A protein has these predicted regions:
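S-adenosyl-L-methionine
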Residues: 3-37
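Conserved SAM-binding strand-loop segment of SAM-dependent methyltransferases
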Residues: 87-95
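A short SAM/SAH-binding and catalytic strip from SAM-dependent methyltransferases
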Residues: 108-119
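Conserved class I S-adenosyl-L-methionine
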Residues: 39-46
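C-terminal substrate-binding/active-site "lid" region of AdoMet-derived donor-dependent transferases
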Residues: 118-157
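Conserved SAM-binding loop
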Residues: 77-78
Length: 157
């Protein structure tokens, strides 16, 4: 097991990348941008222990849904929720990203390079399905997207 400040790759493989928390400075910038508001619902792919969800739901008052495939890390997010001041606005789901059907309320989506391009393609198909079910303005936020992500996103959006 490789450990680096906050990083956990115990269950990482070629498809699902190691857990690494987003720096608070990045979350502060996103939270202060005005792009996420109280009426929005944020979906955090690869939520890990819930940092993005707790911080942005507190800062912006939005509802946040974090999905995580790793049951051990998911359990830590649920444990963290017990002491969070924004717990009533945060939900977690343990599921593989490509199998998750987006709720029609989701209109903000956050990625910190959580998985392979193969999985991203399937996730983007799910996002499009949700959009066609209920057309709405949606914003996707990518923190440190890989070159593969960038090349794909330039052709699919």
């Amino acid at each position: 097991m490789y450990k680096r400040q906050g990083t956990d790759n115990t269950d990482a493989d070629q498809y699902r990348y190691p857990y690494e928390p987003t720096p608070y400075s990045v979350l502060e910038r996103l939270g202060n941008s005005g792009w996420i508001r109280k009426e929005n619902t944020l979906l955090d792919y690869g939520c890990g222990k819930g940092r993005v969800d707790f911080f942005l739901s507190y800062q912006t008052r939005c509802h946040s849904v974090g999905i995580e495939y790793n049951e051990r890390i998911y359990a830590k997010a649920v444990e963290n929720k017990e002491t969070s001041v924004s717990a009533e606005r945060v939900d977690f789901v343990v599921v593989n990203a490509e199998q998750f059907s987006l709720p029609v309320e989701v209109d903000r989506i956050y990625f910190f390079n959580p998985f392979s391009l193969e999985i991203l393609r399937k996730v983007m198909a799910r996002i499009r399905e949700s959009y066609y079910e209920k057309p709405r303005q949606m914003q996707l936020y990518f923190y440190y997207p890989s070159d593969e992500y960038m090349a794909y996103l330039m052709t699919c959006l």
